[in-house]
Amino acid sequence: MELANICNATIAKGIAVQKDSYGGYGVYIVDPGALVGCNDPKLGGDKIELLRVSSVFNVKNLMEAMNALEGEYAEDGQRAADMFKSIIGSSIEELSAVSETCLLVYFMMVIYLMGEQGYAVPMKISRYIDTVLLGTTVNNASNCIESMLIHYEHVALFHELDNNLQKLHKTLISKMPSKKNYSIELLRQIYSATVSRVLEIPQELHEENYMDNYVVTPSLVPILDYVNHGDKTSRNAYYDVDRRKGDIILYLDLTVVNPGKLKPNTEVLITYKDIEDSLAMITKYGFDPANYTTTGTKIFSCTFDKMYLSTNKFDNEIDIRNFYQWFSINPSLQFVLNSENEWLINDSLAEFERLLVPFATSSQRNEHYWIYSDGDDARKRFMEYFDIDEVEDEDEAWAQLETQFKWFESSENDLMPFPPCVWTVKSKFLKEKEATGYELEKVIQNKLENSRALYNETTNQFQAYLENYLDYRIDVLQEYSPEDTENENAVSQLIARELSVLLKIRDRINNNKSIFLNSEDKKYAKLPLLPTKNVERPPWLSEGDDDFDQD
């Protein structure tokens, strides 16, 4: 294929890129017989080279390729190299906080637009953009972000994605030499194609000690980026780096497959990670593989609807949304698919125990219960905490502080940049009659860890609250009609996945089955959490000010 020639890729006989079952493309073994006997004893005899790629695109080598134009195209090359340096150099400050993958998207956009404006750009990069990044339709979250924010407004991940897209677009418009209003749809296309294809490639820092000195770099690897992801039971290949040449190589793994027994058109599949994150898959690729049982781990995370948490108070008194804000508790649940193909709540996470804290209220109301107070008691505690009891105008200092924390309470931000002085607890666990702040949370957490009776009572109260939430959320999801998001696959896939998981959890509750993983396997305590939402800026910060401190 033309792209292989342009990008210096070598493809083994019997291998081809073809349409896959999800509407995209994959790499297939169309003629297994062509691979029989191709294993090289010098490589250990347990693998066959299917693909070798010399041209890899990442931030570093895109910069190098554009700088190299100075010596390749005389004046045109110098002009293009200077323009690229100018655009990127002036963009660094605006893009200092974005990920390296976002920078890769930005570099690709700049190179593409420079080519459109008549600047000399490297042919292989230009062809890759035209053929792959612009020629691949990926119905992932970035291509339907408006609909995703309508249906999942409460999920911080999609606000973060939207903010990244807006930041890249705004920077692009302001830095390109032609002040055209470049379409954000073009950016979304390149963004969606890039994030769905990017691979984490290890890069050597010091040749003499490679294993201890390398970084993982988000990279686009032509042809290899057509290879799809499989679980541990279907994976039959893996990629590696040729340390001597720097090439990326795709190997057929002969420890798991025998090419002589493969059927024609067997798909080549690699495993990216041991953790299969349904939400991440839908966000990046626009689809979620079916349930399966593997030696890996499949998870699904969802964020509570914060309006529900605020309007449906626990015990008719505790505003769960407000409580989670003040204690900076991530308002998300993580579900794990166990070996019996059942979705269960991951209660091994430290953050899950923090979710339980507001529910650690005795039903008898005589042992311990939470109290919210933003009046004189809160004022006293704030003044003591900030040591501002000797200011000239204490009333004015308190008024300013109260205005600020009230603004945060009503904002969409999940984290509060103040100590939780408005929340106190009356408890027989404490020597004092009343305590407050993060120390208070630690006391309750310690009691939860060391009192099985209290833990059971707390989880029961949490489950009762969750059961009502499930009824509410399932009703919302079941009102969804696919026509609402026609051709926006990521939205419909995410709704279907969340609905499926929540229905299974509710069924377990109705059948008096445990909904908790209750595993002693330490790997479950380290699974990744969803990000928290912190996108609104306080009105007392001007546009040029640094973001407020959330620590």
Swiss-Prot record:
Principal cellular location given in the protein's record: cytoplasm
Protein's UniProt keywords contain Methyltransferase: yes
Domain SET residues, every copy: 46-273
Record localization: Cytoplasm, Cytosol
Chain segments carrying region SET-like: 184-288
Protein origin, superkingdom: Eukaryota
Role played: Methyltransferase which mediates trimethylation of cytochrome c (CYC1).
GO cellular component: cytosol
Gene that encodes it: CTM1
GO biological process per UniProt: methylation
Catalytic reaction list: L-lysyl-[cytochrome c] + S-adenosyl-L-methionine = N(6)-methyl-L-lysyl-[cytochrome c] + S-adenosyl-L-homocysteine + H(+)
Family: Belongs to the class V-like SAM-binding methyltransferase superfamily.
Entry domain remark: The SET-like region, although related with the SET domain is not detected by any prediction method.
Classification via PROSITE patterns: SAM_MT59, SET
Enzyme Commission no: 2.1.1.59
Enzyme class at the top of the EC tree: transferase
InterPro entries: Ctm1, SET_dom, SET_dom_sf
Alphabetized UniProt keyword annotations: Cytoplasm, Methyltransferase, S-adenosyl-L-methionine, Transferase
Annotated protein name in UniProt: Cytochrome c lysine N-methyltransferase 1
GO MF term (any one): [cytochrome c]-lysine N-methyltransferase activity
